[in-house]
């Protein structure tokens, strides 16, 4: 039968969601299941064939002989979780007897890490114990009743430790009253459950034990203050009264070794998973007073009576005990443990035993003080000692390991175990004692307690008997001996290691394991897999003992069986029948083997597969990235190489004979021009002519074939001139006067419109064969001022082209050639004019079309080269310098002579027909670029727009006036200069706005020149 229905309903109402897992299918209460938890806290949990194994938390029942020893490593977070779970279970009425409690706490402990201990060697002979198994059981039964009676009056304190909410406590009280107590179920066990839940989370401030003793000794017990981190309970509860007694009981270790097969918790502590708490000898040996009438064996009766007296004083003086802290209670417990060790030696050995322990008999000669009136009578001392031993033995078996181990783990200032110095000396002085049963079976804790019991037995009696028990207890708090204080820390550690090595048990039994691909593996799946292996080997499933699931693996031990199957046989059979086992179990077996459980470390297969998958994915991504970079680099290289290859082919095709000297010289010139950077310093006004294209753009990036870029160059300083400051200011005043005086500007423009050039005949331009070559009949070349082509080289065998040379100061060498934008029929004539006049700079001041009206024919190739009659034009580069203009470079080749020339075109984009640019600054910047390219050349500059008069005339006027000022002219007459231009080509500067723009541009440039001059 499971728990009653009202209890389950109350549990569902009280428990919050997901705090405790659902209870499994229950069995009748009181049924002793294997592996039950809580045997350290409550008796009656383990069966007759089971022993309580100390797992460092609650204790676990295991079948005898117990083979699986481990300790849980409990973190502060895990302790808090266990405390909450215990509070809720205790508050709802569950005890350790309930299967639901077992299930919940087993689930809570399943995720805690374990440290596996080395079990005692099975072959090592066990010496017979001083107490038989029957006497041990008798002590256990009698001690349980005595301890229950002794501690039942302290139940208010234990209940006060449970800090559960009022609702939980009320529910627990009603539930406990409603149901009858089961066998082995008492309030003491439940109270201890609550007590452990609270005290396991205690923490103490860090500090050395030496500092604690120094602070403790000068004070009396009545002056002690409660620890700050101790649990807070009601002031009316005698908390420290019970705590002192429990701590004294908890520190006790049984004096005699257990019999064979005994696996009580105090004996399992021989192979600790961590260093035990330090127990140091008192600083000064003292003796305890003996009761009257017992001079024969003071160790057997006097110490026991004194311990009993101390316990009674703890009852009578709760006010003094209430000030004790956790660390001080631990000290009292250790002291009483040593006294109890001495009592046991006196009972077991008598005076000879005391002599064997190295005593000189000085205790018998010391004074014997009497106890106060509340001491026990002489004839009842031995019985009281028996009862006292039963109480201590009972409490040691239930609470000793838990309280002391938890306290040790939670003390941050705890020191490693220090081996007493006189132990090695006593062993060497008494070699026969090394073969005794006590040393053969003694653990680390027993060696420690026995050693210090000798020092406690040799203490001097205190001056005050009976009533001064608390003063004696305070003065006898354990302290470091002089030998230990003088010993270096390294030597202490070395001695401690040596002592532990002497008592370490043998390696634990090898275990078989099977690693699967499922992480975590469920316990039922692991058991089913082991059962499949058992059926495969035709052995009973009971041959596989201690089946446990660790992550993705199931571990087991093979016990003795009729078929003599060993763990190695199981491993071999698993490997040979891997496919069959995988088919029956539905699991994939990754690994099998045999090894020590403490050394088994399984790599989760999923993590391994995930790591492998991640590694493969990262490798593929890296390879893809590298491949992408290589492909991109190769593509860029191929594109650039292809472009260069096409350019070389075009350049090589300019010559008819690849082997000719002219072609080789031309190719070498091209390579030099593409590789040479311009000089850093500006060229002088009279330097030699340079034919390198790169030198034309010394203030900008080097052009590359078919490259397009943009840059602004307005920050460039104006060209240096020879104009002095006075002349500049005079010219600037003249310009400003013209611009401000609108009437004067109007009169000058009217005079210019009425001006007629002499001579002004245009008969050649008006011939019938030449009329189609004119874009506008309003702008025809004068007969005396026109460019003559070589008729023998012309495709039309004519010397006419609508272009006029513009002379400046030298009538033999024109500075400009003003011409119209080429027509489709005159493109060859245009390139012939460029070639024959030796021009290297073309200034284009019009877009190709305006509002759908063609302004100029596209007379250059967009890419590659075009052939115009005998002239091949190859586009080398095109640079967009700003929004207003761009620059193109051409290679011009005469196919008749195989000669080549570099021609640069400056194309201004934002100047429309019969209009002006939006800003004079952009045109002045454009002019600087043109002059920088042209500087040092003697050939004319070809300037054209649509008709070759309005915009071309304005540009030529501005450039001519500024060049004169740069050469140091003292007087400037812009109107006269314009009349000079119109004498050579009609219609130059077509509108008044264009004339006014010319004045503004000149004034702005003069102002810039004046700013650049040194003041």
UniProtKB/Swiss-Prot annotation:
This is Receptor-type tyrosine-protein phosphatase N2. Residues 421-432 have a biased composition (Basic and acidic residues). Plays a role in vesicle-mediated secretory processes. Required for normal accumulation of secretory vesicles in hippocampus, pituitary and pancreatic islets. Required for the accumulation of normal levels of insulin-containing vesicles and preventing their degradation. Plays a role in insulin secretion in response to glucose stimuli. Required for normal accumulation of the neurotransmitters norepinephrine, dopamine and serotonin in the brain. Optimum pH is 4.5. A motif (Tyrosine-based internalization motif) lies at residues 666-675. Substrate binds at residues 913, 945-951, 990. Changing residue 945 to A: No effect to increase invasion, migration, and metastatic lung colonization in mice breast cancer model. Pfam families: Receptor_IA-2, RESP18, Y_phosphatase. GO terms for biological process: insulin secretion involved in cellular response to glucose stimulus; lipid metabolic process; neurotransmitter secretion; protein dephosphorylation; regulation of secretion. The chain crosses the membrane at residues 616-636. It is linked to Autoantigen in insulin-dependent diabetes mellitus (IDDM). One of its GO terms (molecular function) is transmembrane receptor protein tyrosine phosphatase activity.
């Amino acid at each position: 039968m499971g728990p009653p229905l009202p209890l389950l309903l109350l549990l569902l109402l009280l428990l919050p969601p997901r705090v405790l897992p659902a209870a499994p299918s229950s069995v009748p209460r009181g049924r002793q299941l294997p592996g039950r938890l809580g045997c350290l806290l409550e008796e009656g949990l383990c069966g007759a064939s089971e022993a309580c194994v100390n797992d460092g938390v609650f204790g676990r029942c295991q079948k005898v002989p117990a083979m699986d020893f481990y300790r849980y490593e409990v973190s502060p977070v895990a302790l808090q979780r266990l405390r909450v779970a215990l509070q809720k279970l205790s508050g709802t009425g569950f005890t350790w007897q309930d299967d639901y409690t077992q299930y919940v706490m087993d689930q809570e402990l399943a995720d805690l890490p374990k440290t596996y201990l080395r079990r005692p060697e099975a072959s090592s002979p066990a010496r017979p114990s001083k107490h038989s198994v029957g006497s041990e059981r008798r002590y256990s039964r009698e001690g349980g009743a005595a301890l229950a009676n002794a501690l039942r009056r302290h139940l208010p304190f234990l209940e006060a430790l449970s800090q559960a909410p009022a609702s939980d406590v009320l529910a627990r009280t009603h539930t406990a009253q409603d149901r009858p107590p089961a066998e082995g179920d008492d309030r003491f066990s439940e109270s201890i459950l609550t007590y452990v839940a609270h005290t396991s989370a205690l923490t103490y401030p860090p500090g050395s034990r030496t500092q604690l003793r120094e602070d403790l000794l000068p004070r009396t017990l009545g002056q002690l203050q409660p620890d700050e981190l101790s649990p807070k309970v009601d002031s009316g509860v005698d908390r420290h009264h019970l705590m002192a007694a429990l701590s004294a009981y908890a520190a006790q270790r049984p004096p005699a070794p257990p019999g064979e097969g005994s696996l009580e918790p105090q004996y399992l502590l021989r192979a600790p998973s961590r260093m035990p708490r330090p127990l140091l000898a008192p600083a000064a040996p003292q003796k305890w007073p003996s009761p009257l009438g017992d001079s024969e064996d003071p160790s057997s009766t006097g110490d026991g009576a004194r311990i009993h007296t101390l316990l009674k004083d703890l009852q009578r003086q709760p006010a003094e005990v209430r000030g004790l802290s956790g660390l001080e209670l631990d000290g009292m417990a250790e002291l009483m443990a040593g006294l109890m060790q001495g009592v046991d030696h006196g009972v077991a050995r008598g005076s000879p035993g005391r002599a064997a322990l190295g005593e000189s008999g000085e205790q018998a000669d010391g004074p014997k003080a009497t106890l106060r009136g509340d001491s026990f009578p002489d004839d009842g001392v031995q019985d009281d000692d028996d009862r006292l031993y039963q109480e201590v033995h009972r409490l040691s078996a239930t609470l000793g390991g838990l309280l002391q181990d938890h306290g040790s783990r939670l003390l941050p200032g705890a020191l490693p175990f220090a081996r007493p110095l006189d132990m090695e000396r006593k062993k060497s002085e008494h070699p026969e004692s090394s073969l005794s049963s006590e040393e053969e079976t003694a653990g680390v804790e027993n060696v420690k307690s026995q050693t210090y019991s000798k020092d406690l037995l040799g203490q001097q009696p205190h001056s005050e008997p009976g009533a001064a028990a608390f003063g004696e207890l305070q003065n006898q708090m354990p302290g470091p001996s002089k030998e230990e204080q003088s010993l270096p820390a390294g030597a202490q550690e070395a001695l401690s290691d040596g002592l532990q090595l002497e008592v370490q048990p043998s390696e634990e039994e090898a275990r078989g394991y099977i690693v699967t691909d499922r992480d975590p593996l469920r316990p039922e799946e692991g058991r089913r897999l082991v059962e499949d292996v058992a059926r495969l080997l035709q052995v009973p499933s009971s041959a596989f003992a201690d089946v446990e699931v660790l992550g993705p693996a199931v571990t087991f031990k093979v016990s003795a069986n009729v078929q003599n199957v060993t763990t190695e046989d199981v491993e071999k059979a698993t490997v040979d029948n891997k496919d069959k086992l995988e088919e029956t179990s539905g699991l994939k077996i990754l690994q099998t083997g045999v090894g020590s459980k403490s050394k088994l470390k399984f790599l989760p297969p999923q993590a391994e597969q995930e790591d492998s998958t991640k590694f493969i994915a990262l490798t593929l991504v890296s390879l893809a990235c590298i491949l992408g970079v290589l492909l991109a680099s190769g593509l860029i290289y191929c594109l650039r190489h292809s472009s260069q290859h096409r350019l070389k082919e075009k350049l090589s095709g300019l010559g008819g004979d690849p082997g000719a000297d002219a072609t080789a010289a031309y190719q070498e010139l091209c390579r030099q021009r593409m590789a040479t950077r311009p000089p850093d310093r500006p060229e002088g006004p009279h330097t030699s002519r340079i034919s390198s294209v790169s030198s034309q753009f010394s203030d900008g990036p080097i052009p590359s074939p078919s490259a397009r870029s943009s840059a602004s160059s307005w920050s460039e300083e104006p060209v240096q001139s020879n104009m002095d400051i006075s002349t500049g200011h005079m010219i600037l005043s003249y310009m400003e006067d013209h611009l401000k005086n609108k009437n004067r500007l109007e009169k000058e423009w009217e005079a210019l419109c009425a001006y007629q050039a002499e001579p002004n005949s245009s008969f050649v331009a008006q011939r019938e064969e030449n009329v189609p070559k004119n874009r506008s009949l309003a702008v025809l070349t004068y007969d005396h001022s026109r460019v003559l082509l070589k008729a023998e080289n012309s495709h039309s065998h004519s010397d006419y082209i609508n272009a006029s040379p513009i002379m400046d100061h030298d009538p033999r060498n024109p500075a400009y050639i003003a011409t119209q934008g080429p027509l489709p029929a005159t493109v060859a004539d245009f390139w012939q004019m460029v070639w024959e006049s030796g021009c290297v700079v073309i200034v284009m001041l019009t877009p190709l079309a305006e509002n759908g009206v063609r302004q100029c024919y596209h007379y250059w190739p967009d890419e590659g080269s075009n052939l115009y009659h005998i002239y091949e034009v190859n586009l080398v580069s095109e640079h967009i310098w700003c929004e207003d203009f761009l620059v193109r470079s051409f290679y011009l080749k005469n196919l008749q002579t195989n000669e080549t020339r570099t021609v640069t075109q400056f194309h201004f984009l934002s100047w429309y027909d019969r209009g002006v640019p939006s800003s004079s600054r952009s045109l002045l910047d454009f002019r600087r670029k043109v002059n920088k390219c042209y500087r040092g050349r003697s050939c004319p500059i070809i300037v054209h727009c649509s008709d070759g008069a309005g915009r071309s005339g304005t540009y030529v006027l501005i450039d001519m006036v500024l060049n004169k000022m740069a050469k140091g002219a003292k007087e400037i007459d812009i109107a006269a200069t314009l009349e000079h231009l119109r004498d050579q080509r009609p219609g130059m500067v077509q509108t008044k706005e264009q004339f006014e723009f010319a004045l503004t541009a000149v004034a702005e440039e003069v102002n810039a020149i004046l700013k650049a001059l040194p003041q």
